[in-house]
A protein has these predicted regions:
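An N-terminally biased module of ancient metal coordination in phosphate/nucleic-acid-related enzymes
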Residues: 1-56, 61
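Glutamate identity and glutamate-enriched acidic tracts
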Residues: 13-16, 23, 115, 121, ...
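Active-site gating/metal-coordination segments in enzymes
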Residues: 49-50, 60-147
């Protein structure tokens, strides 16, 4: 069984624009179009059995939209989607409970895109609360091709 554990998708209405921005920032050409349908096509071509989508909440206002989109994709056609939260969101425990209620297995954090250092106390509190609820926590580490060094 092959599982691609680090994928991203975007809502169809913003996927093309978002992919172009990421391509320009990274100086590379994307091999997929950023949509769920594009991911499924890529999975089939590559022989991938499951893909895990890791959305990134880059600002607190994206919380509802990203998690509702993640929940809609989760569990369909060999797709597992995590949720997302920003360390500057208010009511972190309630928001994490909502992610769990949506049936999402965990959250993805991205210190660079969220513009908060990983050793910031906000992350520690957020991670502790997530673990207490039984949510998995994925933290992006290393260099991101879409960000300047």
């Amino acid at each position: 069984m092959i599982i691609d554990f680090h994928t991203h998708t975007f809502p169809d209405e913003i996927a093309e624009r978002t992919i172009h921005k990421l391509e320009a920032a990274a100086g590379i050409h994307a091999r997929v179009n950023g949509t769920l349908a594009g991911l499924k096509t890529s999975m089939k071509q590559a022989g991938v059995d499951y893909s895990v989508i890791l959305p990134v909440v880059t600002k607190p206002s994206q919380f509802d939209t990203i998690n509702q989109c993640a929940a809609a994709m989760n569990g369909s056609d060999h797709i597992i989607s995590f949720g997302g939260i920003h360390p500057n969101n208010t009511d972190i425990p309630d928001k994490l409970a909502y992610i769990k209620q949506l049936g999402l297995p965990g959250i993805k954090l991205h210190p660079d895109y969220q513009e908060v250092h990983i050793n910031d106390e906000r992350y520690l509190k957020l991670i502790t609360a997530a673990v207490d609820l039984g949510l998995l926590v994925i933290i992006h580490a290393g260099i991101d091709v879409g960000l300047p060094e």
